[in-house]
Amino acid sequence: MLCAIYKSKKKLGSYLYVANREDFSLVPSVLLEHFGKPELVMMFNLLGRKALYNVDCNEVLETIKRQGFYLQIAKQDDGLFNSLSEIK
């Protein structure tokens, strides 16, 4: 499965993974407001041989299937995205 990976200009180290390029329809609008305008980093094959940095491909794949997107945040997060479950 190919996915599109976007980085946040507002939040250093935050990445948003979606199944289809430029399709943010399943991402909550509040999350997108905090994330800022997504900047495409790359298209990535989650079922391929290459690994992602700091995140498991299977976890990303399952989360995208379940909720339509995957949010990767920096380990030193200041709490901006910690309440993702409340945003939904």
Curated annotation (Swiss-Prot):
InterPro entries: YcgL-like_sf, YcgL_dom. It comes from the Bacteria. Pfam families: YcgL. Transmembrane segments: none annotated. Residues 1-85 form the YcgL domain. This is YcgL domain-containing protein CGSHiEE_04830. It comes from Haemophilus influenzae (strain PittEE).
